[in-house]
Amino acid sequence: MEKEQNKKTSSLNVLAIAGLQPYQKKTDEEYMNEKQMLHFKKILETWKNQLTIEINHTLLYIQDKSTNFPDPIDRAAQEEEFSLELRNRDRSRKLIKKIQETLKKIKDKDFGYCNSCAVEIGIRRLEARPTANLCIDCKTLAEIREKQMAG
């Protein structure tokens, strides 16, 4: 079920589910105009709705599969499966929160710019990860710093 959920919640798959094509920017088009904002709003709302459906599906799945196995190994396997499902559900819940924050940025007309350096994040990066809040350069630097702190 985990592979099925990851397949469904990919932001690029959400683009297809929303019935949208990758945004075709015109040469003289202003960055993050109304048309672009609407494009990303549709992507984010579709993604949020898909995640909500999957969260509800997880709850029903656990309720349906909940059996009291007499064998301790079977019980342990079931508990491990439920633990993974609940972890996925928690991850989805956190992603929904991030999507809601991003939708607020769109509403406030503050979407598409790096939180660190205020540079345009870029249409293609945002289509790949609509909740991105750092440009690729700042994200790369943040990941390098994170690796240095960990290792």
Curated annotation (Swiss-Prot):
Which InterPro entries does the UniProt record give? DksA_N, DksA_RNA_pol-bd, DnaK_N, Znf_DskA_TraR, Znf_DskA_TraR_CS
Segments forming a coiled coil: none
dksA C4-type zinc finger positions in the chain? 114-138
Q: What are the entry keywords?
A: Cytoplasm, Metal-binding, Zinc, Zinc-finger
- Asked if the Swiss-Prot or TrEMBL record annotates the protein with the keyword Nucleus, the reply is no
Residues annotated as binding Zn(2+):
C114, C117, C135, C138
What are the GO cellular component annotations? cytoplasm
Q: Which Pfam families match?
A: DksA_N, zf-dskA_traR
**SUPFAM superfamilies xrefs:** DnaK suppressor protein DksA, alpha-hairpin domain, Glucocorticoid receptor-like (DNA-binding domain)
| Keyword match Zinc-finger | yes
GO BP term (any one): regulation of gene expression
Q: Where does the protein end up?
A: Cytoplasm
Q: Cite the record's note on assembly.
A: Interacts directly with the RNA polymerase.
NCBIfam families the UniProt entry points to: dksA (TIGR02420)
The similarity annotation says: Belongs to the DksA family.
User: What role is this protein assigned?
Assistant: Transcription factor that acts by binding directly to the RNA polymerase (RNAP). Required for negative regulation of rRNA expression and positive regulation of several amino acid biosynthesis promoters. Also required for regulation of fis expression.
- Name recorded for this polypeptide: RNA polymerase-binding transcription factor DksA
Please tell me the species this chain comes from: Buchnera aphidicola subsp. Schizaphis graminum (strain Sg)
